[in-house]
C-alpha cells in the first residue's frame, strides 16, 4: 500500500509540474489553455477524465488549423514521454473522441504524424514497468492503439478513393483540398455509393477491410485485472458502439454475396466461401464479447444486435456447390478442348482437300484422237495375244482329264466304268438281252405315279437277291476263283516266286509280281491271249502297266524282307532243335524279333 500511495503522489506532482510549464511556456494564452486542458484530461489518476476538459479541447481546436496541429503535437509528446498505462490510455481515449467528434483535419494530421514516424498511434512496444501487475493494462493499451490506427487508416483510404468510394455506416465524408493558404475553407462532400450497386471486386475489398477492423476490435477484449478497471470500461464504450455498425455492414455484404453466389465464377465463389468461413469464426467470438460487455454494463442490452451465426451446414452446402460447379466446368473444358481438336483436324483435312483439288483452269485439254489405221491394228494385235495365251494354256497336261469339257465323252466314260463292275459281257446295242437302256423320267406326264409304275414293269432281266443281302455276283465270282488262280500261275510277268511253304514272294531269287493276285492284262479282244478263256476282262488292267510310286515299292520290300527274316529264323530253329511239341513252338512264337527296320 505504501508503494502505491507513493507512486500516486509522484504522479500528482508530475501533473502539477506539467500544468505549470504549460502556463509559462511563452506561447499565446489560447495555446497555453489547450496544453493545460490536455494535461488535466490525461492525469495519472486511475479515473476517467472529466468531460469539461475534453469539451474545452474540442472548442479550442475548432477555430483554426494551427490549433489542431498544436493539439496533435502535444498529444504525441505526451505519449512519447509517459511510461504509465493510465496516462497512455487516457491519451488514446482523448484521441478517439477528437477523431469522432472533432474536426476532419484531426484525421489527416494524426494519420500523417503516425506515418512520419511520430509515436502517436504506434504503441506496439509500449510497456508499463512501474507496476508488477500492469501487464494486462499494457496489453490493452497496445490493442486499443492498433484498433484506432486501423480505423483511421480505413477512413482515410476510403476518403481518398484508394479503397473505393464507401464509408462505414453510410456517413457523408468530406474531401479536403488544401489551398495555398492551407485552411479549412474548401471542402467537397462525397456521398457513399450503395453496396448493392458496387462491383464484386469492390465488395471483396470492402468486406476484407471490415473483417480486419473487426479482428482489431475483438483483440481489444481485456484480460486479467483490466477486465474490472473503470478506465478500461470507459475506453471500450465508444468502440463497442462502433462495432455495431461494422456488424451491420458485414451482414449486408454477406446478403449481397449470397444473392450473387450462384452467378459467380469458380474463383470468386471460392473467395466467398473463404470469407464466410472467416466471418463464421468472427461472429462466434463477437457473440462472446458482447455477452461479457452486457454483463459489465457497457451500453444498454437493447442496443446490441442479434448475432446471426453461420452454421457448418451452410458452409458444407457452399462447398458442395463449388465442387459440383468446378466438376461441371472441368467437363465443359474437356469437351471444348476435344471440339477444338476436332475443328483443327477438320480444318487440316479441308486444307489438304483444297490442296489436292486441281484448278479447273489449269487442266489441259486432251490430244486429238489417233487415226483409224491404228485402231484397226490394235484389235489384230490383241487377237494374236489371245491366240498365243490359249496355245500356252493347251500345252499344259491334264493327267486326270478333268479339263475336258466334252459332256458326251464324260458320260460314256462314266457308263463304261459303272458297267465294268458287273460280271458279264458288255453289250453296246440297244436290243441286247440285258433289256432296254436307262431312260430319264419325263416330267410332262400329268399322272406321274402311273408313269412310274409302267416304267418299273418294263425293266427286264432283273436279278433276284437272296435273303440276308447275298448277291449272285459274289456267288459267280467264287466259282471263277480257280480259273483266276490258274491264269495267275501261268502268267510269266506276274507269277509267284518262292517255295511252296513260303509266305513271302520273290524269295527264290526271281522278281516279285507288281500286283500279287491280279490276272494278266487283257488283249484287244478282251481276254489275256485266249478268247475262250473263262477269265473276264479286268477293268483295272490298264493300271497294271504303270509302276507304283517309289515309297510304295520301298514299303513292300521292307515287309517282304521282314517276313523272309522271320521265316529263316523259324527254319534255323527247326533244324537245330527239331520238333519239341507245343512248348517249343510256343517259345519260338514268344521270341522277339531280332530285326528292326531302320528308316
From Swiss-Prot:
GO CC terms of this entry: clathrin-coated pit; clathrin-coated vesicle; Golgi apparatus; pollen tube; pollen tube tip
Alphabetized PANTHER family for the sequence: CLATHRIN ASSEMBLY PROTEIN, OS05G0426100 PROTEIN
GO biological process, one term: clathrin coat assembly
Subcellular localization, as worded in the UniProt entry: Membrane, Clathrin-coated pit; Golgi apparatus; Cytoplasmic vesicle, Clathrin-coated vesicle
Full protein name: Putative clathrin assembly protein At1g03050
Keywords for this protein: Coated pit, Cytoplasmic vesicle, Endocytosis, Golgi apparatus, Membrane
Region (Disordered): 332-382, 580-599
SUPFAM superfamilies: ENTH/VHS domain, GAT-like domain
Biased composition (Polar residues): 585-599
Species annotation: Arabidopsis thaliana
GO molecular function, one term: clathrin binding
Transmembrane regions listed in the UniProt entry: none
Residues of the ENTH domain: 26-162
Compositional bias segments (type: Acidic residues): 341-359, 373-382
InterPro entries: ANTH_dom, ANTH_dom_sf, ANTH_N_plant, AP180-like, ENTH, ENTH_VHS
Domain of life: Eukaryota
